[in-house]
A protein has these predicted regions:
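Transmembrane alpha-helix interface motif
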Residues: 2-45, 156-299
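Membrane-helix interface segments
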Residues: 30, 49-50, 133-136
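Short, charged/polar low-complexity linear motifs in solvent-exposed/disordered segments
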Residues: 32-34, 51-52, 143-145
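Membrane-interface helix-boundary motifs at transmembrane edges
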Residues: 46-55
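Juxtamembrane/interface alpha-helical elements of multi-pass membrane proteins
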Residues: 56-174, 290-299
Length: 299
């Protein structure tokens, strides 16, 4: 059984990622960052698998650690003095915590974008924006397809060159550099030819011409209507919370945030449910499928 959120209408997919990525970048409250990172990790594991998640974390965790270490080295604001660096600049608790928050934000956004690239295929982008902004939608769809295609083609070219005795891992430094440049030249040529072929193909099909019709496999059903209303509610409620400073948190010059009240807790609860929407939809669909299967066996 595939991912139910992937099978939703493209408008629902795009609206969810637009809201959750925007909130992940703008809401730097520690609770919001934790919810966003947890939701991104969980959905990445269900969508791409645990092995792919581990591969992402291998470079996301060092990136988060680097952000946490670099910020205190260059930013010395804050009132909680911990120590003095060898340069004589103060090391403050606020600068360390802000670095950790920035690292969590970068990690969550990176994981959400990885999910976006898997769910929002090129066909969905062209379906949503093909008539309104055909040039931009084509560029976005080509960009989303480019990275995985480039990786597959690079592995194929590198393997072919290795069989021809042009390995980039063996030989002298000069020979390895020459072989690597050869592979790079082949990949650049392939990328340009692929872009030209795609542009010629779309032009020959009348893409972007006024009055052009297109076949669509997407249907906006009751489930999509319910999810769309839910996402609009979450977006409006979180926007109201941000404007009312219910989700605010300041790291400088001292740690200050919204007071823990019932309305503040409701903002956090809505944000948590928003981040867990794809996973919750998958869990509900799996539970319904197992119930139907169990009922069929009973009958």
């Amino acid at each position: 059984m595939g991912d139910p959120f992937y099978d939703c209408h493209p408008a629902v997919n795009f609206l969810f990622f637009a809201i959750v990525i925007t909130c992940s970048m703008c809401l730097l409250h520690p609770v919001c960052l934790l919810f966003s990172l947890a939701g991104a990790v969980w959905y990445t594991a269900r969508l791409r698998g645990t092995k792919a998640l581990i591969g992402y974390l291998r470079w996301i965790i060092p990136m988060m650690a680097m952000a946490a270490l670099v910020n205190p080295a260059f930013v010395h604001q804050g009132v909680t003095l911990l120590a003095y660096l060898p340069s004589g600049n103060p090391l403050t608790l606020e600068s360390i915590l802000y670095g950790l928050a920035a690292g969590c934000m970068l990690g969550a956004v990176a994981l959400w974008f990885s999910c976006l690239s898997a769910v929002m295929t090129s066909d969905k982008f062209i379906y949503l924006f093909g008539r309104v902004i055909p040039a931009l939608s084509l560029v976005l769809s080509m960009t989303l397809r480019f990275v995985p295609r480039f990786k597959r083609q690079f592995r194929a070219v590198a393997q072919a060159q290795r069989y021809m005795g042009r390995d980039t891992a063996n030989g002298s430094l000069r020979q390895r550099t020459r072989n690597a440049l050869k592979v790079f030249s082949i990949m650049v040529t392939w990328s340009l030819e692929s872009a030209i072929d795609t542009a010629d193909s779309m032009r020959s099909r009348g893409y972007g011409e006024p009055g052009r019709t297109a076949f669509s496999i997407y249907r906006f059903d009751d489930r999509d209507r319910g999810l769309l209303l839910w996402l609009l509610f979450c977006g409006a409620y979180l926007l109201a919370g941000a404007l009312a400073h219910g989700l605010s948190f300041r790291y400088y010059p001292m740690l200050t945030g919204a007071q823990p009240q019932a309305i503040t807790v409701s903002f956090f609860a809505v944000y948590l449910l928003l981040c867990l929407t794809p996973v919750g939809l998958s869990l509900a669909s799996g539970h319904r499928f197992r119930s139907m299967e169990k009922g069929g066996r009973t009958v």
